[in-house]
Amino acid sequence: MLQNPTFWVLVAFVLFVAAVWRIAANTIGKALDDRAERIREEIEQAQKLREDAQAALAQYQRKQRDALKEAENIIAAAREEADRIRRRAATDLEASLRRREAQAMEKIAQAEAQAVQQVRDLAVDIAVAATERILVQNMDATRDEVLVGNAIAELPAKLH
């Protein structure tokens, strides 16, 4: 058997396979270890990215809640401002209407006073004209002298 070349080929083949196996096992083991390390790093990176994404999502949700609260505050402030403007406009309108009513009442009072004055003036004019006509119709020279004499006699008493 030691003389048989097939035996030595078999021994050489087994030694070759063992050497290749040892080298290949180390290389394959190292390659598998490297690949496992890369996979572990990728998993860690994926977990880190997931945590970052969750943090970003939480931050976005906080910002969205804050934005909604701010929008609600802005809407509430706008409503308050609109109510304040509406109340001020109503107050201003009411004051304006009161002023216009007072002005109208004043104009009406002035017109009434003017009308009353015109009626009085007209009544005085009519009374003077009627008195003049009556005096012209009823006066004669003797009566005229008596009235003038009486008026002159009463004059010193009225002056003192």
Swiss-Prot record:
<comment type="similarity">
    <text>Belongs to the ATPase B chain family.</text>
</comment>
<comment type="function">
    <text>F(1)F(0) ATP synthase produces ATP from ADP in the presence of a proton or sodium gradient. F-type ATPases consist of two structural domains, F(1) containing the extramembraneous catalytic core and F(0) containing the membrane proton channel, linked together by a central stalk and a peripheral stalk. During catalysis, ATP synthesis in the catalytic domain of F(1) is coupled via a rotary mechanism of the central stalk subunits to proton translocation.</text>
</comment>
<keyword id="KW-0472">Membrane</keyword>
<dbReference type="InterPro" id="IPR050059">
    <property type="entry name" value="ATP_synthase_B_chain"/>
</dbReference>
<comment type="subunit">
    <text>F-type ATPases have 2 components, F(1) - the catalytic core - and F(0) - the membrane proton channel. F(1) has five subunits: alpha(3), beta(3), gamma(1), delta(1), epsilon(1). F(0) has three main subunits: a(1), b(2) and c(10-14). The alpha and beta chains form an alternating ring which encloses part of the gamma chain. F(1) is attached to F(0) by a central stalk formed by the gamma and epsilon chains, while a peripheral stalk is formed by the delta and b chains.</text>
</comment>
<keyword id="KW-0997">Cell inner membrane</keyword>
<dbReference type="InterPro" id="IPR002146">
    <property type="entry name" value="ATP_synth_b/b'su_bac/chlpt"/>
</dbReference>
<dbReference type="Pfam" id="PF00430">
    <property type="entry name" value="ATP-synt_B"/>
</dbReference>
<protein>
    <recommendedName>
        <fullName>ATP synthase subunit b 3</fullName>
    </recommendedName>
</protein>
<dbReference type="GO" id="GO:0005886">
    <property type="term" value="C:plasma membrane"/>
</dbReference>
<keyword id="KW-0406">Ion transport</keyword>
<keyword id="KW-0375">Hydrogen ion transport</keyword>
<dbReference type="GO" id="GO:0045259">
    <property type="term" value="C:proton-transporting ATP synthase complex"/>
</dbReference>
<keyword id="KW-0812">Transmembrane</keyword>
<keyword id="KW-0066">ATP synthesis</keyword>
<dbReference type="GO" id="GO:0046933">
    <property type="term" value="F:proton-transporting ATP synthase activity, rotational mechanism"/>
</dbReference>
<dbReference type="GO" id="GO:0046961">
    <property type="term" value="F:proton-transporting ATPase activity, rotational mechanism"/>
</dbReference>
<feature type="transmembrane region" description="Helical">
    <location>
        <begin position="5"/>
        <end position="25"/>
    </location>
</feature>
<keyword id="KW-1133">Transmembrane helix</keyword>
<keyword id="KW-0813">Transport</keyword>
<keyword id="KW-1003">Cell membrane</keyword>
<comment type="function">
    <text>Component of the F(0) channel, it forms part of the peripheral stalk, linking F(1) to F(0).</text>
</comment>
<keyword id="KW-0138">CF(0)</keyword>
